[in-house]
Design a protein with these regions (language model features):
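C-terminal structural segments of small proteins and small subunits
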Residues: 12, 46-78
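Short, charged beta-turn/beta-strand-edge "cap" motif at the junction between a beta-strand
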Residues: 4, 23, 45-50
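Short alpha-helix capping/helix-loop boundary micro-motifs
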Residues: 2, 25-29
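Conserved beta-strand/loop element in small beta-rich adapter and peptidoglycan-binding domains
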Residues: 37-43
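Short, basic/aromatic beta-hairpin or loop at an interaction surface
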Residues: 8-21
Length: 78
C-alpha cells in the first residue's frame, strides 16, 4: 500500500490524499467531509492516541483513529 495512514502524519505537516479504504459508510462519510483523492490536508493535532484534528478545505474536522487509518496519504515536504 503506497503512502501512509493519515493517523501517522505528525501535527504541523501537510499531505495529499491518495485513497480511501474501508466499509462503504466510512468511505462515504470521509468523502462527504472532503477527504477525496488529490485533496491537500493539514494535520492540526495528532497526539498518538484519541481523535485527530485535520484541516481540509479550510475546515477543521475531528477524526477517530479508525477513520484516519482508512485514509492513505502522501506527506508533502516543503
Amino acid at each position: 500500500m503506497p503512502g501512509i495512514g493519515l493517523d501517522e502524519l505528525p501535527a504541523g505537516n501537510d499531505a495529499e490524499i491518495l485513497n480511501l479504504f474501508g466499509g462503504g459508510s466510512i468511505v462515504s462519510r470521509l468523502a462527504a467531509l472532503g477527504f477525496v483523492p488529490g485533496m491537500r490536508v493539514s494535520m492540526v493535532q495528532n497526539r498518538g492516541h484519541g481523535p485527530l484534528i485535520v484541516s481540509v478545505i479550510n475546515t477543521r474536522v475531528a477524526l477517530g483513529r479508525r477513520e484516519a487509518v482508512s485514509i492513505r496519504a502522501r506527506r508533502i515536504t516543503a
